[in-house]
Amino acid sequence: MIRAVFRRTGAAIDRGLAGHAPGGIERLADEPYGDGPDDVLDVYHRTGAQGPAPTIVWVHGGAFVGGSKEELRHWFELLADEGYTVVAPRYSLAPESTYPTPVRQVVAVLGHVCAHAGRLRVDPERLVLAGDSAGAQLAAQVATLVTSPVYAERIGIEPRIRPDQLRGVVLCCGAYDPSLDDTPSLFVRAVLWAYSGARDLAGDAAFGLMAVPAHVTADFPSVFVTAGNADPLLPQTTALVERLDGLGVETDTLLFPPDTSPPLGHEYQFLLDTPAGREALSRILAFLARRV
């Protein structure tokens, strides 16, 4: 049932973005980055593009139990039209796969695109890690892993790139700390049970490592962060921003006054028929241009 909800939401996003999609974009579909059935990625770039380009690895959302890279194809086309190579991985979903499998997969994606940079038109020295919703959590966690050897050792996953290769991070409407809300909704609780594979989340030390604000360091890359004023996950974003600001991390934040109307909900950035959605895309592109 939960996946059906995400399929409907994803289809609506796909339809909404279709009218904004540019022409002249090529897609390499389902490039294997590992041995598993979910270990595939898509690569987008301008038709006829030659040589390497700054590369965005964008991890899709879906509460770890749904969503797909295909639902955001027109978003990736928009980014590729700006001259970027865009990499969109599939990752394994809960409850069939549990944490930290998707973290390992995103790390493997970074290693794969660097190992095959020439063929995929990737510039391995100019990488940006990005994501929305659950994908934003994965992007933030992997960026922490890349830039903190202590955290990488604790989580037991070896980075596949150097910290200086990761030029920036883009985070949209993410859930960064499962311990932030002491009384999560039944929906959130069910999602976290599925993703962790454990009912006692408070007692699961490994799952506690998912809490990004507790583990980021001053070496975290420059980051763009946004969420809507009516997003239920907004407190997750404000807590992360407060932590990053306290560490002195260069943070470009797009948040909105509480009385913004119409209210901006979860994943508002994909609604390009709205002024707020267009502002988010413009700010993301400006951040990318500065960083790579």
Residue spans for each PLM region:
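Alpha/beta-hydrolase superfamily serine-hydrolase fold, recognizing
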Residues: 1-292
